[in-house]
Structures are given as C-alpha cells and as structure tokens.
Amino acid sequence: VNAVLLDDTLISCLEARLGELLRSERADTLTLEGRFEISRISAALSGRPGPAPRAILMTGLQGAGKTTLARAMEEAGFRRLCPDEEMFRRYGHYGRDFPRGEFLVREAPVLKDIALEVQQLLAAGHEVVVDHGFWTREERALWAATVLEAGGEPVLIYLPAPHEVRWDRIRKRNAKSLVDANSISFSEEDLLRHANRFEAPTADEPHLVYTGDPSAMLAAVDRTRKGNRNGRAS
C-alpha cells in the first residue's frame, strides 16, 4: 500500500510540475531547460524507461573538425546525419552542378528532411549526431526544440578553431571538392566573411567545448548524463 501511495504522490508531483511548465510555455517564458524537463516528465508519465536518447548538435565554422568528431561519435554508436552529404547526393557539386547563390534555397528542404529523420530516430530510442555547423543562436534553439519535441536530450558542442588552422585544412580539402561531399570548396575570403556571421555560444547556452580530442569529447558527452552541461573536454 505504501508503495502505491508513494507512486501516486510522485505522479501527482510530476503532474503539478508539468502544469507549471506548460503555463510558462503558454506565457512564452519557458527556458530551453524547461522544455527538456517537459520531455522528461512526459516520458516518465507515459511509462517509458531509461534516460532520453541524446542528439549531438555542433556549432563551428568550416574546418573546425566537425566531421572528424561526428565520425568518431558514429563509431561509438551514434547515428550520424550530414546535410552536406545529402546536398551532394541530391544536387551534386556546389558551384559546378548548381550555382553557388542557390545553396541556401536548396539546403532548406534538406535540413527539413534531416530534422524529421532526427525526430524519428530519437523516437525509436537511437542517439544521433548532426554533422552540421549551426552558426546562429536562433538556429541552435530551433534544433534543440526539435530534439525535445521527439523526447530527446540536446547536447551542444562548440568547436572553436583559429582561422589559420581552419584555412590550412580547407586549402587541402579544396583539392577534393569535386568528389568529396565533405570538401566543399571555399576561398580564404569566404572563411573570413562567414566568421563575421558566426555566433559563438555563451554561458546561457549550455554547451561543451571541443579541444581536438574525440575520445575526450566522448567522455565529456557521457558525463552529461550526470548533469554537467557546461565544460571543456580534457
């Protein structure tokens, strides 16, 4: 009887907290962490066991090491989804098979389809890494909400890298741009222009910082299960 009463009490507390969060959502005052809490409470009330599957969202410019890290996470069991590879599959080479000025227009439906695939994978219990840069705070918030709606846990990883390092990598990659979906050709002027548009995450966007070691980053991601949502992989 005591166990039943305890369960009933816990359910009542969860329902009350869920009501508070939903009122905050209607008032447009709900934080990103609040959205995650809604997802977790809803999962608990529905009887789904275990922690929420994670979706790794990366933020960084070209040449920062996103694909290297994403492939390491894929080897560790995450499902890797890459918009650039899907763009190459659908449309061919950027600047040869379609004009450079059409990239964003063509990318929009690709990102929409990948967002849907992310939700489907999370709903099935799979963990996901999105091999993409997510340059702006607004874009990151939208994708985090997409993850939360599917019952997943968004984990943001920031990949800072000096311009000189990125440009050296891009120069080497440019030679493969006609055959490699992950080697889109960019000039140094492109990189400098894009850097001015990039919004690095601040302390109010919980994130991990990648320092170039995939193994250390995987360990840091595992520690997010214990509630450490900010930090540097070391």
For each of these PLM feature ranges, what is it?
Residues 150-170:
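Conserved phosphate-donor/acceptor-positioning beta-strand/loop module used by diverse small-molecule
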Residues 30, 105-154:
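Glycine-rich phosphate-binding loop used to anchor ATP phosphates in small-molecule kinases
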Residues 58:
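Hydrophobic anchor at the beta1->P-loop junction of P-loop NTPases
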Residues 176-227:
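Small-molecule kinase domains that catalyze NTP-dependent phosphoryl transfer to phosphate-bearing small molecules
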Residues 61-62:
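The conserved Walker
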Residues 68-126:
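Conserved substrate/cofactor phosphate-moiety recognition/catalytic segment
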Residues 65:
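Conserved glycine(s) of the Walker
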Residues 22-47:
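N-terminal pre-Walker A segment at the start of P-loop NTPase domains
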